[in-house]
Amino acid sequence: MCSSDLARAAYRHLIVNEGREAGASLPHTHAQLYALPFVPAAVARERERFGAYATRTMGQNLLGDLVQEEVRRRERLIAIDDEAVLLAPYGARFPYQLMIAPRRPRARFEDGGPLGAALLHDALGRLARRLGASPPLNLWVRTAPQGAEYFCWRIDVLPRLVHLAGLELGTGVSLNIVAPEQVAAELREA
């Protein structure tokens, strides 16, 4: 893949896999960058939600407003710096799922410099102290697809502590046994 292929891609998806439980095909932590010729359905739905919210709120950013509310309430806030926040997201699908998002909304991760890097390092350290060194995990950067006017990037961190079973696989319903508020409290102390 050359840089022009990457620039033309409908969606770019950066992932990091750690551990066999996280589906890693290699025995060491590794990152991969995918340049997809289409926008995945989950990203397209998110793009639509961002657009609908901006229309209803005269241009406000959905994730930007959620971040402001999480900072105000502090229940699920783990850490904050000048550029980004580290949260245990409301409605997390899995135990110890985390999100890093910019304090000021930006559509594309790649347009913002090292935003979130310090908090990502902090998040991984907190998870290691709480769950043990190098817990199996996936992380990915959700960034705006081509042509998305309203969007906001984020980094999702998903420790792989539970296995998907019949409920999750058969219905798409997630059963999270650790409340995000509990995760935030534990990781603030880690």
Regions from the PLM with identified roles:
Residues 1-190:
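HIT superfamily nucleotide-processing domains
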